[in-house]
Amino acid sequence: MSISREPRVAVVGATGAVGNQLIELIAARGFQLSELKLFATEAGAMQTVDAAGEERLVDALASPADLRDFNIAFLACPAPRAAEIIAAQPGPILIDLSAADRPPADVPMVAPGLTSREAFAQLRNAKVFAIPHPVAHVLATSLKALGAYSGFVAATAMLGASAGGRDVLTASVDQTTDLLSARLELDDDEVQRGFNAFMREHERSVATAISAQVATLLDKAPTLSIQVAAIPVLHGSALTVDIQRPRALKGNGEDAVELLRVAPGILIAEEGEPLGVIDAVGQEAIVVSVETRADSISLWCVFDNARLAALGALWIAETLALSSPTLA
C-alpha cells in the first residue's frame, strides 16, 4: 500500500491519555490527511472525543482487519493489543507507542532530533516503527546536545500518573478522593498512588528499557545509571540528570546552557525562576534548568510525557508523508 501526502489515518486507543494528545496534535500541527478514524477497546467505544473542534465518535476495533484500508495506524493502546495488531500485519504502516516501555527489538526506534532524515530514509520499507519512552527521548536529547557520549551519567525519572495511561490516571484521582475522605481501602496487591511516591518491579523494568533505548538512539552512549519512580502527579513527569562534564565543555557553564538552548525540543528555564512539572503540561517542549559545577552538569527537566510521546509518533507520520508523494 502506498502513502500519499494526505494519508488515511487510524488511531487505536483514541480515548487514552496519549491517544487524546495525538488527536489534538494532528489538528494543532496541521497534519494533512484524507481521513481520520478513531478506535478504542470495547470499553472506550461509543465515546466521543474532540478532534479539531468536532465531536467524533470512537468505534470499537473488532479485529486488526478493521485497519486494512488505512495508510497509517497509530497504536496508542496496551502492549498486548498492539502486539496482536502487529502480528496480524493488517496493511498500514504501524506506529507502535506501546513500545515505549520495552527495550528496542527488531523494529526501528526513531525520534525527532535524534534520528536524521538520512537514517530515516533508509527505513522507508519498514512496516512498523517504535517510539522511545519520553524519558529516553529527553535524556538522549540532552546528552546529544552536550556531547556526553562517554563518562558516567546518573538519572532519576519521576513519572506522573499519565505515564501509565487513562486507567492509572483514573485510579489516582479516585484514590486521592478517597484518601481526603478517609475511606480509602486497597486490595492486598494494590499500591497506594494518592499522596505516595514508590518504586516497584515495573518501574525497575522501565528503567532498564530506558537505558537500552538511550543506547540505541545515540549509537554511542555514556555509562548510565537510571532509576524510575512513580509520583503523585496526574499529568507530566520530571527527570534529574547528573553528567560528568565532557572534556570539550570548559568555562563557567554558559557553554552547556547554550548547547542545550539550541537543541531541538528544549526550552531553557529562566534562571532563578521556580520550575515545576505543572509548567510543562500542555507544552511540546522539554523545559530544562541547568546547574553547572567544576566537574559536572546537573539538569532538572520537566515535560508532558503523554504529549511528548504523541509528538514523536506524529513526527514519524509527518516524515513518511513528506518524504515522497508516495512511499512503497
Mark where each language-model region is.
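N-terminal Rossmann-like NAD(P) cofactor-binding subdomain of oxidoreductases
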Residues: 2-191, 223, 247, 278-281, ...
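A glycine-rich, Thr/Ser-enriched phosphate-binding loop motif common to dinucleotide/cofactor-binding enzymes
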Residues: 129-138, 169-171, 205-212, 308-314
